[in-house]
């Protein structure tokens, strides 16, 4: 039996302000830093020791991973950063307040943009300052790989090569792996692992800063999955994510 630990970054400043964040590189709040440290304590208490960790190229995930490894006394651990673990790109919604956007376009439309599988938000133009094409961390990417907007289907498509070519082989070789990423890049992985339908994925919400443990068989099929920590607090955190875009 193999354990894989998934963790959404701690609360960011734009989580606190209820904004669509996407690829914008916003930092953690003080609460987010505490969530990250607490996640490390929960993982350590579970007796899990990592061999390798993966995260995005966005500081809210990177800093969360640092805090986790610090609490586990594993700051030396090999860490691999990839844009393929970035949050989905919210296009022209990036930076907008979710509640205000719901008031303007309607809760139903915003829910489709936030949680549907194959409907992306309105796209950015390449001349928009929010388009990440000029960011040096994406310098090695082809222009066509840098998104103007993404739905979850797009996020799955750009994440799965990293899973199949890099992460899954590490797990199969016996390595204990941590993936610290974002709500939608983790939804992409959970959809794949649990074979969740395109309709049912709409209802999946992942809270910030709470470790999600998968127990996998030798074929990397899930035997079970569970959040660490107080389960009532987990339910409240999941419900809070679900309610973010209510008008």
Swiss-Prot record:
Reactions the enzyme catalyzes: (2R)-2-phosphoglycerate = (2R)-3-phosphoglycerate
SMART domains named among the record's database cross-references: PGAM (SM00855)
Assigned keywords, A-Z: Gluconeogenesis, Glycolysis, Isomerase
Function: Catalyzes the interconversion of 2-phosphoglycerate and 3-phosphoglycerate.
UniProt GO BP: gluconeogenesis; glycolytic process
Origin species: Chlorobium luteolum (strain DSM 273 / BCRC 81028 / 2530) (Pelodictyon luteolum)
Protein name as it appears in the record: 2,3-bisphosphoglycerate-dependent phosphoglycerate mutase
EC number(s) reported in the record: 5.4.2.11
Binding-site list for substrate: 8-15, 21-22, 60, 87-90, 98, 114-115, 183-184
Pathway(s) annotated for this protein in UniProt: Carbohydrate degradation; glycolysis; pyruvate from D-glyceraldehyde 3-phosphate: step 3/5
This protein's record includes keyword DNA-binding: no
Coiled coil: none
SUPFAM superfamilies per the UniProt record, alphabetical: Phosphoglycerate mutase-like
Similarity field: Belongs to the phosphoglycerate mutase family. BPG-dependent PGAM subfamily.
Domain of life assignment: Bacteria
Keyword Disulfide bond tagged: no
List of catalytic residues: 9, 87
Alphabetized GO MF terms: phosphoglycerate mutase activity
Positions marked as site (Transition state stabilizer): 182
